[in-house]
Amino acid sequence: MAVTKKIISQYDVKLVTKWAPPEGDDLRPLIAMPNIPKPTHGLAPRTLLGATTWNRMRKYAYAKADDTCEICGAKPENLRHRHGHEVYSIDYEKGTVTFQRVFCVCALCHLGCIHTGRAITLFRQGNPLYPKEFLLEGAEHAFKIINEYNKDHPGADLRVYRTFLDYLKCDDLREDMERLIEKYQVKFYEEDSKKMAKWGDWKLAIGSKEYPTPYENEKAWKEAMEKQGEKDTARLLQKNMEEKFSGGVYDELNAILNEPVENLNKKGIDISNNE
């Protein structure tokens, strides 16, 4: 459910036409990355590139980061609590989502701060893994990181993606979220809908390859989500995408993709399992 204009009007929400990851070593801004535009749902690199390639990429990201969250600096005792997530740049006017790389992120930053759209949906469905306490913990975690980043970088004006405003539409969350927004003086941003590319123009770019939206329109997207959910839809799309763009190697991807497994093992990067 989209954020209502009435809710948006009560807060400082900046309209943007692009989003790009930070260029320096400070990766805290990744906590504010936007949700993937609906037309490109189901086009996850982990699906399109296959399990072997995806596992190699994320294992490399874990090793490079020393199993430490590249956003908040946490190093989970249980390595199953560190995840791999995609970094994208998004051009809303051109309708292009460009895959950049995979980075190491802790479970709280990943599930409670980045995947906010999924979090609010599962909370509404009563999923026991997404209770009220977890959503609020994720929100406050994100707000703290953004405040600290702005203090360290005067004039940065890093903002929270507008999905957190959806929390205000839940009776069980509204009062606590209003308190957190006031406490941290949170500012938001969202896509400028008036300048958005048409639905059929959206695509996901991986290197020189472009994967077009698999949905004819928003109605088709809704039907697909209702029938199987995004994960199942992605699986069904995989064969079709491989047929459209078969052959060749994604040369522009991280050089790690072409490095022999034995070299990775020597560096302590084990890609033999799915941890």
Regions found by a protein language model. Give the residues of each.
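A boundary/linker detector
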Residues: 1-57, 74-78, 132-275
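Histidine-centered nuclease catalytic patch
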Residues: 50, 55-58, 70-104, 113-125
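Active-site/pore-lining binding-face segments in mid-to-C-terminal subdomains
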Residues: 94-156
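Sequence/structural segment immediately N-terminal to covalent heme-attachment motifs in c-type
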Residues: 59-65
